[in-house]
């Protein structure tokens, strides 16, 4: 890959990464793959390269993905009505068949293929495999009352042994966000990939949870671009949750869940930027918003980078 950096600048980039390579060696990093990074061909390639890079320098990446745009496209192509209530997809049994097919048969296979173009590293599995996830059907409060949105659930338990086996074998697990209903194991639920990634990060003792989005991070006062938060304590974030817009709230709730589960750091980063994961992990400034177990709030504009 050609860059405009001089040789000495390239060396500076590598040296800046050295302490982070040392600090994160052998650590597990759970990455929620989503947003524009899933639909733009160049960004998909960059994401696959990032996962391979992490693996080759001694980290253990674990990928969890959804597939909202791909599901919507397939439902439309098949003439199946797609309804949303309170920003959540109503998942009928007919739609669930499509969700399962798209996530495990299309999105997962494509990402596994992109990673494995660099060597036999990635293995696809879903929340159904090896009892990885168990979920409970969800009845969210919409307009003040519990609402039936069909076969949609929240992960309530994790058996990470299948993922642990893959990590021990040097593989990169790629996990699709569907899960059996804990009350009826023959029924499969569509689960939120952000929440599933947080639950898995806690279960495997991940050093970081990284969630890819289509925004720069969490803003304290959107649309003021100077209000981009660089670091925020989990209690400060918990206080903000009720006022967050519907697209950002589940991602920040996932960060809270990860921190509450013992994950030291959770990040929201802009997946529209090529190699954003490497920029977050291996540079001093990082990018996006980092959630920490302690208290406090720092604006990214205060960093001086």
Swiss-Prot record:
Gene transcribed to yield this protein: argB
Q: Where in the cell is it found?
A: Cytoplasm
What's the stated role of this polypeptide? Answer: Catalyzes the ATP-dependent phosphorylation of N-acetyl-L-glutamate.
> Could you tell me which pathway this protein works in?
Amino-acid biosynthesis; L-arginine biosynthesis; N(2)-acetyl-L-ornithine from L-glutamate: step 2/4
Binding of substrate occurs at 67-68, 89, 190
Q: EC number(s) in its UniProt entry?
A: 2.7.2.8
- Cite a single GO BP annotation: arginine biosynthetic process via ornithine
Chief subcellular location: cytoplasm
EC main group:
transferase
Quickly give the catalysed reaction.
Answer: N-acetyl-L-glutamate + ATP = N-acetyl-L-glutamyl 5-phosphate + ADP
GO MF: acetylglutamate kinase activity; ATP binding
Q: Where is this site: Transition state stabilizer?
A: 32, 251
The portions of this protein that span the membrane are none
Q: What family does this belong to?
A: Belongs to the acetylglutamate kinase family. ArgB subfamily.
* Keywords of the record: Amino-acid biosynthesis, Arginine biosynthesis, ATP-binding, Cytoplasm, Kinase, Nucleotide-binding, Transferase
The name this protein carries in UniProt is Acetylglutamate kinase
Q: Can you tell which superkingdom this protein's organism belongs to?
A: Bacteria
Q: Which Pfam families match?
A: AA_kinase
Single GO cellular component annotation? cytoplasm
């Amino acid at each position: 890959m050609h860059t405009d950096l001089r040789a000495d600048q390239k060396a500076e980039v590598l040296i800046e990464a050295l302490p982070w390579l040392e600090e994160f060696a052998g650590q597990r990093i759970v990455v929620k793959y989503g947003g524009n990074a899933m639909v733009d061909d160049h960004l998909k390639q960059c994401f696959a390269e990032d996962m391979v890079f992490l693996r080759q320098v001694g980290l253990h990446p674990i990928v969890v993905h959804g597939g909202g745009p791909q599901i919507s496209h397939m439902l439309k192509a098949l003439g199946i009505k797609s309804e949303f209530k309170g920003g959540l997809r109503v998942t009928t049994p007919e739609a669930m068949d499509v969700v399962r097919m798209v996530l495990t048969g299309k999105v997962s296979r494509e990402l596994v293929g992109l990673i494995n173009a660099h060597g036999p590293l990635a293995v696809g599995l879903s929340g159904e495999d090896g009892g990885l996830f168990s979920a409970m059907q969800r009845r969210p409060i919409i307009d003040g009352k519990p609402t039936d949105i069909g076969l949609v659930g929240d992960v309530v338990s994790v058996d990470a042994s299948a993922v642990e086996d893959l990590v021990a074998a040097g593989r990169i697990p790629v996990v699709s966000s569907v899960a059996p209903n804990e009350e009826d194991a023959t029924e499969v639920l569509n689960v939120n990939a952000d929440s599933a990634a947080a639950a898995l990060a806690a279960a495997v003792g991940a050093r970081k949870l990284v969630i890819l989005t289509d925004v720069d991070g969490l803003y304290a006062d959107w649309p003021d671009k100077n209000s981009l938060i660089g670091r925020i304590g989990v209690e400060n974030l918990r206080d903000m949750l009720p006022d967050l817009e519907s697209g950002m709230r589940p991602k920040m709730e996932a960060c809270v869940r990860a921190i509450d589960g013992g994950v030291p750091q959770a990040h929201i980063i802009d997946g529209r930027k090529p190699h954003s994961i490497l920029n977050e992990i291996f540079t001093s400034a990082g990018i996006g918003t980092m959630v920490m177990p302690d208290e406090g709030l720092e604006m990214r504009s205060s960093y001086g980078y």
